[in-house]
């Protein structure tokens, strides 16, 4: 099996001759183009968000850097059309590529010559319009368009055509460009493979190969790293790789000072986008903090065809310039000049083992990230595809091996080889990471090797506008943009995923481009919506890319040990939902641990580290078999498995991490978890605060032992060994100090074994000396005073003896001796194990109760046996504080809409995440992975009884004044289909059949006068009469008329007399005798009336 070599011999089919140049394989762009199987010419045009040409307005008169062709806008749209392709690029400025205040440095042989601020304005990343989730674009707009377009499972590369026509163009036109597929590239080194073989001897290999590490022992899934000291392990957090980029003098000469800066940044722009892909399983930001362009050779930097020697020289050189540039030119200490990794881009055709050109493209140490002299790489410039080389090599510094080398990726039926493939073929997808790469970087960060990536450097931020182009241009107008002025929309189905338009030949066609965002749409669940990211959503809403959310915790795994304190683990994955459309990867704890099987192992059990070392006895090491035992010398990591070959004078690290639950050191109860030393309480529980007292009793009160200390002065110097003190069995915290600067000889005598220390100054420091069931450590302080210390307890009594040369005090001693069992109280308080966490997530609690135990057998007894005054306080701690995964929260069902027969009831259904015990956060429905529970359901009650049914009311009778309305009331069945006898319905519930009414007031009664009768006089004045009666509005007789308004019933009349006969005199004028009211007639001036004038002729005469 080939080791996970860091040499990248990617197939040169990645794209030769991109950007401003052609590679060493071709002398000109014409020669390069002739090598392609096919290519096309396109004229990229800057357009608006819907593909329409921009209105041209002349720029203001100002000086502009020649040839950039760039814009300062944060968002751009370009249309790239060729005979077989049609792309509408949606580009957004890459704000995360450059750290704040980054500068470009030009170095001569003497060091830094001059520097200026970097110009990030022409670096863009994005996607094809309407295809945010299925396409990728990384483009530099300086000097034309240079970059990659990934769409429809094909990679396209674009670069300006050299020597194109230079006629006048509008600012939106970019001139002729070459567009070709990566699959059309051909190169003689296509089958070049990794040049490292198994049979090469380990000794003598270059240092970057000696550091190779095996793949993770088991798939780590979605585990992430531990953080800096004090931070939790297995917690996913954002990482920031501050990157130094160096272009050698051949790069500067080839591309020219005018263009090399933007060319290099265009490459790094693609690198940054590759590390942003969610397939990496971690959030890693590539930031350029320093860009150095070498215009001359450097005195201490040797770059040649030999990749190994060039890498060695570059790694040392980049370390030397961290705080200085050139010969002592200081870089301001603002944090920007520091870097986590260094990238060299060279125009040399490099080769791994010889100083001649060959197919090697890159070289980097595996697992070198955050190590100052190993976090570096050399990369051959092959055009824009250099970005894949750099991303590949940085992957190696994260501990990634090649896909298929020491792992299953790339094998048949397994995850295909991807960005970390040893060489790229036409079937390889270099834009995503394989599951093996994800496991490698997770293991690397999980082991605490990425601490330097936790700090967040300053960066340049930009505000991006948000638009809804479909609101400005409806679907018909979008069709006219694509197919001419007579086109219009012709299919109205899933317009958000595919816009269908009438062609010039009046056929309904589509180019598979979705309608613009904001275009009106409708589905069976949305009456009025608009298109957003190829989906019809409620009008006005803008659902962004879905951020990842943690799924549920897996069940606790098996315990790592059967006794002595093991570890059980549980993990969760960022898949509820998975991050999509650029959504963020989950941050937070992804693996948790708990203690298990904490009881002591049986007496005589083999040391757990010894067991692990002995498992390698049957595995050959460099072709031979050895018996391995634990090595605990200086410089050994506490949680790595370092074993000594018994009988041989060498040791080696057999495993990067011991089995979980292994003690970190012999004199501590702390244990190793995932390669990191974790604190445990003396009860062997992770995270427990329970501590030993001075007697080494867990949770004790110090009453089980007494401290014995003193200073010994010899009685007869030189007379032989003298007894100093007797240390009883079970003593702990033993301390013996030599006060005579080793002018004494010390001995420890036991029942079965002894320890003699002579010539202490010559003993290697520190030294570990096993005796009486414990380990004594020989230490030497800064004042040269030596001491012998042991944690204990000792399993046999010891006598301290000394052979002194002077009468001066020779030894100081101190230890804690056990008190006789008879004098110990028989019962004492102890902490019980922690209870199970009260909640699975969002913050639960655990309680550690206190119980009274028998000191002799540790059995629990009734509380009254222990002293109430010494009772320990009950403990409580938080647990499972991480937020719960999104889930549906369902309310109670409402009452049925009907109390009998069939009805409907409803309830509230909300997608939310419980953040803590007192806080819940409502989320969009798409965040919940499970189907939404129903909001409505049918409900049924008892059969409804018959009921009264009333028909409509009749009109009010009479039409004015008080009246009545009438209606028909029937007894009906519950479904109103059958009419039943009235006895079937409740009489008390019967609605009324009549109702009083009063539409309006009736007209008042009025006087009605008849016709006048004939005059009573046949000649002269007389009277006539008529009838006057009071009638209602119905014509009936009434007594309600106003008397004052009653019309008269008589009237004076005058009949015409015949002519008088001769001799007849005039008739005498007199009052009628029967009338006595003539004076009143005169008084009230009624004489003008004919009647009164006739009746009172005399009285009225003359008036």
Swiss-Prot record:
It is an enzyme of class 3 (hydrolase). Glycans are attached at residues 90, 222, 323, 740, 795, 892. Residues 213-233 are annotated as: Disordered. SUPFAM superfamilies: Metalloproteases ('zincins'), catalytic domain, TSP-1 type 1 repeat. It is found in: Secreted, Extracellular space, Extracellular matrix. Its cofactor is Zn(2+). One of its GO terms (cellular component) is microfibril. The keyword Signal applies. Keywords: Cleavage on pair of basic residues, Disease variant, Disulfide bond, Dwarfism, Extracellular matrix, Glycoprotein, Hydrolase, Metal-binding, Metalloprotease, Protease, Repeat, Secreted, Signal, Zinc, Zymogen. Residues 706-828 are annotated as: Spacer. Residues 1065-1103 form the PLAC domain. GO terms for biological process: extracellular matrix organization; proteolysis. Disulfide bonds join 315-376, 351-358, 370-452, 409-436, 479-501, 490-508, 496-531, 521-536, 559-596, 563-601, 574-586. Glycosylated. Can be O-fucosylated by POFUT2 on a serine or a threonine residue found within the consensus sequence C1-X(2)-(S/T)-C2-G of the TSP type-1 repeat domains where C1 and C2 are the first and second cysteine residue of the repeat, respectively. Fucosylated repeats can then be further glycosylated by the addition of a beta-1,3-glucose residue by the glucosyltransferase, B3GALTL. Fucosylation mediates the efficient secretion of ADAMTS family members. The active site is at residue 393. Widely expressed in adult tissues. Metalloprotease that participate in microfibrils assembly. Microfibrils are extracellular matrix components occurring independently or along with elastin in the formation of elastic tissues. Interacts with FBN1; this interaction promotes microfibrils assembly. PANTHER family: A DISINTEGRIN AND METALLOPROTEINASE WITH THROMBOSPONDIN MOTIFS 10, ADAMTS A DISINTEGRIN AND METALLOPROTEASE WITH THROMBOSPONDIN MOTIFS PROTEASE. This is A disintegrin and metalloproteinase with thrombospondin motifs 10.
